[in-house]
Curated annotation (Swiss-Prot):
It comes from Methanoregula boonei (strain DSM 21154 / JCM 14090 / 6A8). The lineage of its organism: Archaea, Methanobacteriati, Methanobacteriota, Stenosarchaea group, Methanomicrobia. The gene is rpl31e. One of its GO terms (molecular function) is structural constituent of ribosome. One of its GO terms (cellular component) is cytosolic large ribosomal subunit. This is Large ribosomal subunit protein eL31. GO terms for biological process: cytoplasmic translation.
Length: 88
């Protein structure tokens, strides 16, 4: 198993998902999270944990959260694994 190189906590804004049709907003929010992490962690290989998906879809497809707090870990092989960060 690859060892962790970098670990960051990001608060990702999901405002752009509100500009999509109502029934596509949660899908758009997931794509926005992937795009944000790919840009900031400088890689295209992004894996999202199930907890992120559950948080985005918790209020249905039409009402995703306006922002989400995510812990992203970049492995030695360049892959980014993201999970929902605990609120403190």
């Amino acid at each position: 198993m690859a060892e962790e190189m970098k670990e960051h906590i990001y608060i990702i804004p999901l405002r752009d998902a509100r500009r999509m049709p109502r029934w596509k907003r949660a899908n758009g929010a997931i794509k926005d999270i992937r795009k944000y992490l790919a840009k900031h962690m400088k890689t295209e290989d992004v894996k999202l944990d199930k907890t992120i998906n559950e948080k985005v879809w918790s209020r249905g497809a039409e009402k995703p959260p306006s922002k989400i707090r995510v812990r992203a870990m970049k492995m030695e092989d360049g892959q980014v694994q993201a999970e929902l960060a605990l609120e403190s």
